[in-house]
């Protein structure tokens, strides 16, 4: 039943990406149909409970952050590919986190932020904290603030509620394009 099938691209949904996501889905959908597979006409709205969404039996296609896939979804869904968002300094299909701070903060190295207030988007986020924790765990020994989104982490740093945050490089690019990164600087980039 095509009407019950769902598809989503929930990782990058700012207004600037809506058209690109729709075009990407149209290409995927058309390829699926050419290959004899049913596919919904349009993307489903991004749900508030992504874990339930990703486990929905009606799910045909979606994307997830790496940490939820490795930690909980790998036995429930099939990984069919990794998109290439052409992140600077990364091979095709890879990404990195950018560690940001206020531009007027005198600390200019990641080590100088130990311990400091760290904002992260979600406990199940590879880019929001896990990539940084795997690379330099000592820097995350200070207070932490879960913000609910990369955009909210950026805002927390801008407003001085947090001293630094790790932001997905693709999201950072979207936020820069939308003019939402004023007063911030990148102090570190994680390994791809």
Locations of regions flagged by a protein language model:
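Periplasmic-binding protein-like
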Residues: 6, 81, 89, 95-98, ...
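Local beta-strand N-terminus motif with an aromatic residue
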Residues: 57-58, 77, 110-113, 141, ...
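N-terminal hydrophobic or amphipathic helices and topogenic motifs
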Residues: 1-76, 82-85, 92-94
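Alpha-to-beta junction loops
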Residues: 55-62, 116-118, 158-167
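Pocket-lining segment of extracytoplasmic ligand-binding domains
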Residues: 124-192
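Generic preference for hydrophobic
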Residues: 61, 79-80, 99, 118, ...
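Bilobed "Venus flytrap"/periplasmic-binding protein-like clamshell domains
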Residues: 7-27, 91-154
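Short, surface-exposed beta-edge/turn micro-motifs
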Residues: 56-59, 95-97, 115, 192
């Amino acid at each position: 039943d095509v009407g019950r099938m769902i598809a989503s691209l929930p990782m990058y949904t700012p207004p600037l990406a809506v058209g690109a996501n729709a075009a990407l889905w149209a290409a995927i959908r058309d390829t699926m149909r050419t290959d004899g597979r049913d596919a919904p006409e349009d993307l489903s709205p991004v749900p508030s409970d992504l874990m339930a969404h990703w486990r929905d039996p009606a799910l045909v296609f979606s994307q997830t952050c790496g940490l939820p896939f490795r930690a909980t979804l790998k036995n429930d869904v099939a990984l069919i590919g990794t998109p290439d968002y052409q992140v600077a300094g990364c091979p095709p299909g890879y990404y990195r986190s950018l560690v940001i701070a206020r531009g007027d903060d005198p600390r200019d190295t990641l080590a100088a932020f130990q311990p400091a207030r760290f904002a992260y988007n979600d406990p199940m986020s590879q880019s929001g904290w896990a990539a940084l924790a795997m690379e330099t765990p000592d820097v995350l020994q200070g207070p932490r603030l879960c913000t609910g989104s990369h955009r909210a982490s950026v805002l927390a740093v801008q407003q001085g509620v947090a001293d630094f945050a790790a932001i997905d490089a693709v999201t950072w690019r979207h936020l820069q394009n939308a003019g939402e990164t004023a007063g911030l600087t990148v102090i570190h980039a994680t390994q791809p």
